[in-house]
Design a protein with these regions (language model features):
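Non-heme Fe(II)/2-oxoglutarate
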Residues: 1-88, 93-95
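Catalytic core of non-heme Fe(II) oxygenases with the double-stranded beta-helix
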Residues: 70-212
């Protein structure tokens, strides 16, 4: 899917007071090692700590930005539910390699969480909770094909030709405290290794019916 806008950003959208309030609420939750697809722990792909939180006031704070980005970026994706929010903490040498947030199939029809059944992640949100002066590294980066490729003729391309068409984008503004970045969940992104200090963020996914 070729997009006009691969992400939408709201710089310093959330006040410092609310950022610290979110951190305080999240630190009360149990912390575990972050996992990758299918809940497998793969330290070569991801090394960080996470906890989970579901607070109505956090959704009420963030959802208006999701609706605005969805409209202004011309995605207009159907979605009707938020997953649990994930509080993520990276310290020195921790990272999250290239990945997408969208699985290759919907949540199971018999998922114990009724609101997840038969749905996929449509939009991803990351809220920056740490002042950029408190850490080094931990950059937020995207990558995508710079031009649309005819998938029917993919086999004609060498790996080098594909690599030449991949664009990597460093989102410098994403480091600002209180900044929200929203993007389609199928877009590739990563967090580069932390070299000093600690980076904290809140991540959430808006889910809906699979694309047709």
């Amino acid at each position: 899917m070729q997009l006009k806008n691969n992400y939408w950003i709201f710089t310093k959208a959330i006040s410092k007071t609310n950022c610290y309030k979110i951190i305080k609420a999240c630190l009360k939750q149990s912390k575990i090692k972050g996992t990758v697809a299918n809940s497998k722990l793969k330290l070569r792909a991801r090394n960080c700590y996470v906890s989970w939180i579901s607070e109505d006031w956090i959704y009420n704070l963030l959802n208006p930005f999701i609706h605005t980005a969805n409209r202004n970026a011309n995605w207009n994706f159907q979605w009707d539910w938020n997953e649990l929010s994930q509080f993520t903490e990276y310290t020195k040498n921790q990272f999250y390699e290239w990945h997408t947030d969208q699985d290759n199939k919907p949540y199971a029809a018999d998922n114990k969480m009724i609101n997840l059944r038969n749905k996929i992640r449509k939009l991803s949100l990351t809220l920056q909770l740490t002042d950029p002066a408190e850490y080094d590294g931990g950059d937020f980066e995207f990558k995508w094909f710079d031009v649309e490729i005819d998938l029917a003729s993919e086999f004609q391309y060498s790996k080098q030709k594909f690599d030449d068409k991949i664009k990597t984008v460093l989102v410098k503004e994403a480091k600002e405290l209180g900044t929200i970045i929203i993007f389609p969940s199928f877009v590739w992104h990563r967090i580069t290794p932390i070299t000093k200090g600690k980076r904290q963020s809140l991540v959430n996914w808006s889910i809906g019916k699979p694309f047709i």
